[in-house]
Each structure stands twice: as structure tokens, then as C-alpha cells.
From Swiss-Prot:
Pfam families: Ribosomal_L6. The lineage of its organism: Bacteria, Pseudomonadati, Pseudomonadota, Gammaproteobacteria, Pseudomonadales. Belongs to the universal ribosomal protein uL6 family. It comes from Pseudomonas syringae pv. syringae (strain B728a). This is Large ribosomal subunit protein uL6. PANTHER family: 60S/50S RIBOSOMAL PROTEIN L6/L9, LARGE RIBOSOMAL SUBUNIT PROTEIN UL6M. Part of the 50S ribosomal subunit. Coiled coil: none annotated.
């Protein structure tokens, strides 16, 4: 069995889990998430925890059990606490402003960039150069943060661009004459 799948997923108070066929739905204070469980993985619902068992012992099935456990753990954490990513804008005139479901970005282009946020994702701008992306789906929060970063990645000479708050940009030295 996968070492990851051996550990059960503990359900905090206020989180409900429903298993109908191969569809697992997790409901919590922040919302509801659903996942189709792979047919080779069996989910055992016990008192206050979930266990994941591979139906047969081959390597691929054990790996799928571990992957499923990690995905469900992220779902449980998302509906109870939520996820967030912080982005920073570095550069002269780089600004961000959140208006409802649209994030307006000024990134040094000749035009402003308007990014439409998907359902379940919220963006805040505590300052003009900071963006806070929140949601219950870990994959979607990371995907939105990556798409915003891709508008203007940090460049290695001056470090200008959109970067994750914890990202360290490797700097290059300018060309010498």
C-alpha cells in the first residue's frame, strides 16, 4: 500500500462526507467540493476519518490510492479553512485593483489587463502591489495565481513582474562593456 494512503484523513468537526457510488462529496463551512474516485480505489468511511485502500496490490493502483488520499485531504482542508496565495507586483507603475469578479492589472503594457476570476475564487488587493487570492479548491487557487503571474513573469535583470510572495527571483548581472 502507498505510504501516503496508509494515513487516514481526519474529518474536523463541521465537515460532512457523502459517498454515492464513486462520487465523494465533502461539505463544510466554506462550501462543497466533489471528486470522482478512481474505480481501483476503495474509500472506507469510519468514525471521524476516511481510509483509502487499493483494490489490488499493483504499483499503479497503490499510487492512485495515495493520490486520491492527498486530493481528499486538500478538499477537507479547503472546505474547513480554505486556501490562499499571495502575489506581489514589482515595477514602476504596476498596480492591481479587485472589482467584484474582475481583477484589473496595470503591468506596463499599453493596455490594462482585466482578468475574470472563475467561480469560487475571490481576490483582494490590500495594497496596489499586493494580490490575495482565496478559495476552497487548492488546484484552482494555484491555477489562478499561475495565470496572473504569467501575464508578466519576474525578469532576472531588474526583478520586475508579478511574483509569488514567497518566491525568490534569481538575479543576473548586466552585461559588461
Amino acid at each position: 500500500m502507498s505510504r501516503v494512503a496508509k494515513n487516514p484523513v481526519k474529518l474536523p468537526s463541521g465537515v460532512e462526507v457523502k459517498l454515492v457510488g464513486q462520487l465523494l462529496s465533502v461539505k463544510g463551512a466554506k462550501g462543497t467540493l466533489e471528486l470522482n474516485i478512481h474505480s481501483s480505489v476503495e474509500v472506507v468511511v469510519e468514525a471521524g476519518e476516511l481510509r483509502f485502500v487499493a483494490r489490488n496490490g499493483d504499483q499503479q493502483t497503490r499510487a492512485m490510492a495515495g493520490t486520491t488520499r492527498a486530493l481528499v485531504n486538500n478538499m477537507v482542508q479547503g472546505v474547513s479553512q480554505g486556501f490562499e496565495r499571495k502575489l506581489q507586483l514589482v515595477g514602476v507603475g504596476y498596480k492591481a485593483q479587485a472589482k467584484g469578479t474582475v481583477l484589473n492589472l496595470a503591468l506596463g503594457f499599453s493596455h490594462p489587463v482585466d482578468y475574470e476570476l472563475p467561480n469560487g475564487i475571490t481576490a483582494e488587493t490590500p495594497s496596489q502591489t499586493d494580490i490575495l487570492i482565496r478559495g476552497i479548491d487548492k488546484q484552482l487557487v494555484g491555477q489562478v495565481a499561475a495565470e496572473i503571474r504569467d501575464f508578466r513573469r519576474p525578469e532576472p535583470y531588474k526583478g520586475k513582474g508579478v511574483r509569488y510572495a514567497d518566491e525568490v527571483v534569481r538575479r543576473k548581472e548586466a552585461k559588461k562593456k
